[in-house]
From Swiss-Prot:
Keyword Magnesium: yes
SUPFAM superfamilies: Adenine nucleotide alpha hydrolases-like
Primary gene name: nadE
Family: Belongs to the NAD synthetase family.
InterPro entries found in the cross-reference section: NAD/GMP_synthase, NAD_synthase, NH(3)-dep_NAD(+)_synth, Rossmann-like_a/b/a_fold
PANTHER family recorded: GLUTAMINE-DEPENDENT NAD(+) SYNTHETASE (PTHR23090:SF9), NH 3 /GLUTAMINE-DEPENDENT NAD + SYNTHETASE (PTHR23090)
Oligomer status and interactors: Homodimer.
Disulfide bonds: none
Coiled coil: none
Protein name: NH(3)-dependent NAD(+) synthetase
One protein family per Pfam: NAD_synthase
Organism: Alkaliphilus metalliredigens (strain QYMF)
UniProt superkingdom: Bacteria
Keywords: ATP-binding, Ligase, Magnesium, Metal-binding, NAD, Nucleotide-binding
Length: 247
């Protein structure tokens, strides 16, 4: 019952955000993960006829695409797929070639710059679509990701509103169960699908359970506490506006 009340509160909040912004609907990128699945369900409840889910594969695993489609079909949201493979390859190859000509290219930094490029291409596409249908772009970051900075600046962090940023990862799963998210999505290990074997927890160096406990004020091992505090500190710039000089 508590989840039901909170869900209705967020749905009402989504309607308020749209009304205050002068827009008429909501757009979300659906990745096939639990966070975007929950958000897709929430925005569909708020605007059954004016919500849109966009699946944006970029050299994505077929399982991710299938889970994204399953989410959209299960919740009933209007959805479309925009494949960005060619656009990604075009931008990445041109950037690499430009740096190679200047002898500045660093192969060791390709993986992270590639991952961030994918997130930013998706963001640009979502805003292009949202502008055309007079909608807000809805983010999918949860409290753990927001606190640790586990998102791409001006990528998946480039959104208008963040309806589940107050939920821990475990709460997101609880909401997913309540909202009827497909079991395949509930069972999958959290991953951005950026490269083979990539998972959120491997990349962060700690677990969502530890981060959730930390955010709830519970005791966590010193090693995990230090990792969480370090991630929060180095990602501060992602949560604020760019600095300005005092001229």
């Amino acid at each position: 019952m508590e989840i039901a009340m909170k869900v209705e509160r967020v749905v009402a909040w989504l309607r308020e955000q749209v009304e205050e912004s002068g827009t008429t609907g909501l757009v979300v990128g659906i990745s096939g993960g639990i966070d975007s699945a929950v958000v897709a369900n929430l925005i569909y409840r708020a605007f059954p006829n004016q919500s849109l889910g966009v699946i944006l594969p970029i050299r994505s695993h077929q399982d991710d695409i299938d889970d994204g489609l399953a989410v959209a079909i299960a919740c009933g949201i209007k959805h479309t797929t925009v494949n960005l493979d060619n656009e990604h390859e075009n931008v990445l190859s041109k950037a690499i070639n430009a740096l190679q000509k200047l002898e500045l290219y660093d192969e060791n930094k390709l993986r992270i710059s590639d991952a961030n490029l994918r997130a930013r291409l998706r963001m640009s596409t979502l805003y292009t679509i949202a502008n055309n249908v007079n909608s807000l772009v809805v983010g999918t970051d949860n409290a753990a990701e927001l606190h640790t900075g586990y998102f791409t600046k001006y990528g998946d962090g480039g959104v208008d509103i963040l309806p589940i940023a107050g939920l821990t990862k475990r709460e997101v799963y609880q909401w997913g169960e309540y909202l009827g998210v497909p079991q395949s999505v509930l069972n999958r290990e959290p991953s951005a699908g950026l490269w083979e074997g990539q998972t959120d927890e491997k990349e962060m160096g700690t677990t969502y359970e530890m981060i959730d406990d930390f955010l709830e004020g519970k005791e966590v091992p010193q090693k995990d506490k230090e990792i969480i505090e370090r991630l929060h500190g180095i990602s501060h710039h992602k949560r604020v506006m760019p600095p300005l000089p005092n001229i």
